[in-house]
């Protein structure tokens, strides 16, 4: 069974993944990977797609993955950047706990820093064409980038929260949210006030693709509807795609094909790369 698709994989151009580290402004050692597109030519310029992992207590590693397949995302002609931001697992318990009390701000800064390092060290990346996106906690962070930077031409948010307060009241992760946010919502501590993306809605400007499974109980549909409504209200170019028969993950074959088609179409539109 481990060799079932080996012959098919042999016929696919899968460039080696490039690993790199940098020291963040806060002195933390951050691990990253660059995934290159098939037919990569270092003399050419490629747009950058910053992909943000969920969790937050998981990590990017060199693996074959269905939901966010790195090589499939890179295939139309993108360099894909994967960053194990603060809170990622695999680097010790203390490192994983750094996100408690600071769920979005530092991780968002590290993602931007990683993009800066990638641009500095890889002249084949076109810094004028960058997009960021992720699912679940990666969607949360994509929404935080919406609130805090305009460096990206577009954003992609799958199952991402935009409102910490409504997420607390509808998700199945009440306790974990309180741990990361420093207490229950009614205490209105600094995180609830300062790291809630919707509080910065007046600043939303970046075109965004919002996708969600209608049966999602981890990050329920209401947060995606809230986000899309705000984007429409602010006249930010945006698209909402709801999968009625999917939960937190987009797993069914035809739905997965549509999911990737939507992502590639959005990237092609804003990063000026022909869709494939």
Language-model-derived ranges and their functions:
Residues 35, 51-52, 133, 211:
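Short hydrophobic segments within beta-strands
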């Amino acid at each position: 069974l481990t060799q079932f698709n080996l012959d098919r994989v042999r016929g696919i151009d899968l460039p080696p993944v490039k690993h790199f580290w940098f020291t963040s402004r806060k002195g933390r050692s951050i691990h990253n990977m660059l995934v290159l597109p098939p037919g990569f030519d270092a003399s050419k310029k490629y747009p950058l797609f910053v992909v943000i992992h969920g969790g937050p207590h998981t990590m990017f590693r060199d693996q074959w993955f269905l939901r966010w397949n790195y090589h499939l995302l890179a295939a139309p002609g993108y360099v894909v950047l994967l960053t194990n931001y603060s809170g990622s697992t695999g680097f010790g318990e203390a490192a994983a706990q750094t996100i408690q009390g600071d769920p979005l701000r530092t991780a968002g800064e590290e993602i931007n820093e990683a993009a800066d390092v990638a641009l500095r060290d890889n002249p084949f990346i076109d810094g004028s064409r960058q997009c960021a996106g992720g699912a679940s906690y990666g969607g949360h962070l994509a929404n935080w980038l919406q609130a805090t930077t305009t460096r990206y031409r577009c954003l992609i948010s799958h199952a991402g929260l935009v409102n910490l307060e409504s997420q607390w009241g509808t998700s199945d992760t009440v306790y974990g949210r309180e741990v990361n946010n420093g207490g229950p919502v009614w205490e209105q501590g600094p995180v609830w006030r300062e790291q809630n993306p919707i509080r910065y809605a007046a600043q939303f400007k970046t075109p965004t693709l919002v996708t969600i499974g209608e049966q999602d109980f981890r990050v329920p549909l209401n947060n995606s509807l809230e986000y899309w409504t705000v984007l429409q209200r602010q006249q930010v170019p945006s698209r909402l795609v709801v999968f009625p028969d999917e939960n937190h993950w987009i797993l069914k074959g035809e739905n997965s094909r549509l999911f990737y088609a939507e992502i590639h179409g959005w990237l092609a539109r804003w990063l000026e790369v022909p869709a494939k």
